[in-house]
Amino acid sequence: MGSLSQQAHGPPDAPRSKEELLIHAKDFINQYFTSFQMNKTRAHFHRLGEINDLIEKSGTYDLTMAELTFGAKHAWRNAPGCIGRSQWSKLQVFDAREIGTPREMFEALCSHIRYATNEGKIRSTITIFPQRKEGRPDFRVWNTQLISYAGYKLGDGKVIGDPANVEFTEMCVEMGWKPKHGMFDLLPLVLSAAENSPEYFELPTELVLEVTLKHPEYPWFAEMGLKWYALPTDSGMLLDCGGLEFPSCPFNGWFMGTMIGSRNLCDPHRYNMLEPIGLKMGLNTETASSLWKDRVLIEVNVAVLYSFESANVTIVNHHDASTDFISHMDKEIKLRGGCPSDWVRMVPPMSGSTLEVFHQEMLLYNLHPAFVRQDVKPWKKHVWKSDQSVPINSCNPKRKLGFKALARAVEFSASLMSKALSSRVKCSIFYATETGRSERFARRLSEIFKPVFHSRVVCMDDYAVETLEHESLVMVITSTFGNGEPPENGKQFAQSLLDMKRKYDCDLGFLESCSSISTCIKSSILTEGPLAADVIGDRQSLAMGTGPLCNVRFAVFGLGSKAYPYYAAYGKYIYLMLQELGAERLVNYCAGDALYGQEQSFRAWSEEVFKASCEAFCLDNRNDAPGPQTKGDCSKVRIVPVENCQEPDLCQVLRNIHGKEVMPLILAERIQLQAKDSDQQTILIKLDAHNATDLKYAPGDHVAIFPANSPEIVDAILVRLDTSKGPSPDQVVKTEISTQLGTNDTWRSHLPICTSRTAFSFLLDVTTPPSQEILQVLATQASSDMDKHKLEQLASNSEAYEKWRLDLSPNILEILDEFPSLKIPPSLLLTQLPLLQPRYYSISSSQQKNPNEVHATIAVVRFKTQDGDGPVHEGVCSSWLNRSPIGTVVPCFLRSAPHFHLPEDPSLPIIMIGPGSGIAPFRSFWQQRLGEIENTMPSCENTMLSCETTIPSCENSMPSCENTMPSCENTMPSCENTIPSCENTIPSCENTMPSCENTIPSWERTMQPCQIILPSQTKKHFGEMVLYTGCRTAKHMIYAAELEEMKRLGVLSNYHVALSREAALPKMYVQDIIIKNAAAVYEIVMKKGGHFYVSGDVSMAHDVTRALELVLCQQGGREASQQVMSLRDENLFHEDIFGSFVRKAGGQRSEDE
């Protein structure tokens, strides 16, 4: 059974009452939050409360951009008369709610037409103008279609052009439009905006794409001069969303062929071309029985489809449209229990019974959000002003402005800028970072995009990924931390993308076998395919896209270091995930290597992506990326003295700048771990939290320490700066940067209130070689042409810059020395230098043993640049901690490393690989195990008696084994763990005392009572812990005595030390010992399901992984690399790695940027 066509009554001109509005608003917000599974959450209830308060106070409220996008898409989804609404999720929404004049409306509509036309590859688009408000005339587009043809009524009643537009054409002529009296004259747009008088605007001919109609078999068809426009844009609908009404919201999809061929050209009340074409075809038009009308109708529709397809303009035939809708309807019934449909409007105007929709039972009902048909003749209701004949842009005599008038003008100018920004395409630039470099690149990209797009920079952690589908243009700039991990503020973003993929698609592609984000990211490195493909020059229409992000265009730039096996892996993961979710890439994935050419890679990528973005959004005359803004302008930065003000607490300042929970720990103790005659220094620092209740960490976690720069370097920099015209270095100041909004300059704070000395000491990085961008700024301050030329060369020539950076690794002081003509105002340097970033160290303590302390094992960095011939450079943090007096406040925060924690089951054995300072996290492991053993076996002393009494029998029977027995006696505190060590001592007895061989069975028998007694007293069974460590020589060994103690106590089952430069021994590395103990390693990892931990620099970790692969291959005959990947995926293979020390490059390099 079909339905009758019901035309919804248009809403009244006045907005809804508060009560009715609140009902609609609550229903809509419930739909919105339910759509991404956040209903009944804190955010949901907060938004409901916020809207309720706004309606009570003002009688209305505003939708967020995400809510507006959701509403517009679902209004199309709910439209009962649209056969093409299966593409509802791909609708592009342009927010024009800040627009205030007809001229601004026209500019927004031109942008809409340009974007939607897309050179023929039509994109479904809607532009939404301000909502209806009490006491304000509506914003309206008076045309029923943005693009339509004029109709001229002649004296004899005949019409030239489109008869449907005769009345509107006459109204345009009355407004002053000059008619051309042709069959296909483009009508002007007539627009009204609130209290403004309506205005008409001619559409630029180059903006409107028209298709000349021709027939594949009738050459004469082209001679008839028929044509039609490519973009069908309905501008007479009202969007009813959340109780708010938007009377002006032009919307387009793309044509179905019959809309042009049957309705527009052949309908008797439109162009009525049936008979002229029938006569051309030689048909008998005198009798209906010849079915000439049907034959003409078919050929006209064939011509329309043929012409559009030949011109590469998007169009769909009515058969495919019918099939597509039936499929959509089936899905909707499964998902929502129904699909409102108007049979009369759904069935195409030809081939009725041959289509599935013709035979489909439909039910017509209304859902909200909704599109509602309005009065199509707004000029009938408009109250024309008596003085409208006066030109709107007429000039008044100039007069002088007073201060108040000038202030109002400034405010008005700022509001115009705000409106201009709101009408632009919005571009969201997401970043994730550990050191701040990704954020700096993101802000630089924003500066490039700002002149054309409405760009914003957002940290991934601050963004709700559920709203990503409502974005139009997305840029991602992210680093990779450690061994292929996301930065801390990018973890949730990564997980949310994976959750979205699993929600919308059961086919996970390269993610199918991944059990965690970490393995997903690592798997992305092995994925080729889309990354290797060239950018598709002729982009596919979004109508053909699939996935929840099919309406999003994106690009990704990854930062990393090729020293790492998972180079820039997180960026690649984001790139692949966005593609998997249906987003359209603008350019291929690009990564910048921290070791070489990162700045150059970013520059090339940013230029390419800017051009691609302008092309994607059809922005004309934007072929070149804007050049960087002049940052050397000292008038745009300033420091202002602050009188009678003390500096704020340093930890609070760092908390505000970095957004971390910074704690003031106290340096309680510092221990030199290496021998006095060692040429290296490694220190153990103990930080006291003085009973802080929020000190919580697990073995394997990290402590991030905010260091201070060397006082000598800071003092020397302050002496070299040009402070003649400014406050002294010890004067408390405000550091500010000028930003422009319209014509109004406003000053915003760049750093917290503090002295210049404090800023250079604790807040700014003065030791890292400056970027090319900073060198460009410094070049503006050089008074010598030679200095200026060299600085400009370094700033523009990436190859010269990289060589200079790697050879000299210069800090700011050395640059001031190298370029003596530099006279830099403190304000400029304070605003250009990057922030001093925290240094991350593995925690070397356990709260089981040290509940109020955090220990860290730190290699003190000290080296000479220029291959050992340059000045001495020191590590910022390690040197500060090495020289700071006991009692110094150390600002720091804790970071969880969940992938490097001990196994939840303590009975599982573990292997720990950590040469040099890589041993740091394993100290927390053995401290944790020692504490657990002590807490688990409170009555072990009683059980030791039975064990101790068995020892004399062995001693008496094997007097020469006496030296081996004490280790057994001393291991009794952890009695269960001593048995393997006791058994391990027996072979040495056998080897040293063959005569004792017969007594060993009695030893083993006498140990059984201990093993029988222990289970009744022991709560847990602990797996063995084996450590592989290494260093250059014995004097470089750290924690030697502690390791021996842990073995004596049975905490460590065993440990092995590799010495690589001991004179009397062959060179040995940890990977060599692993291969040497292949059988034992294989036993623990593969047969006992043990965990394998690696800590240290990246090159060592790579060698250890290769060694483990060799062990697995030799011992088990397995596919080695696949087996290690399987261990990773099962969370049995753990890595906590950092960059190697590269002397030429100036210190430690990490994959984190």
UniProtKB/Swiss-Prot annotation:
Signal peptide: none annotated. NADP(+) binds at residues 911-929, 1089-1104. It catalyses: 2 L-arginine + 3 NADPH + 4 O2 + H(+) = 2 L-citrulline + 2 nitric oxide + 3 NADP(+) + 4 H2O. FAD binds at residues 697-708, 836-846. Keywords: Calmodulin-binding, FAD, Flavoprotein, FMN, Heme, Iron, Metal-binding, NADP, Oxidoreductase, Repeat. Pfam families: FAD_binding_1, Flavodoxin_1, NAD_binding_1, NO_synthase. Residues 660-903 form the FAD-binding FR-type domain. One of its GO terms (molecular function) is FMN binding. Residues 934-1010 are annotated as: 11 X 7 AA tandem repeats of E-[NTR]-[ST]-[IM]-[PLQ]-[SP]-[CW]. Sequence repeats lie at residues 934-940, 941-947, 948-954, 955-961, 962-968, 969-975, 976-982, 983-989, 990-996, 997-1003, 1004-1010. Expressed in the central nervous system, in the serotonergic cerebral giant cells. The isoform Long and isoform Short are expressed equally in the CNS. L-arginine binds at residues 145, 254, 264. Its EC number is 1.14.13.39. This is Nitric oxide synthase.
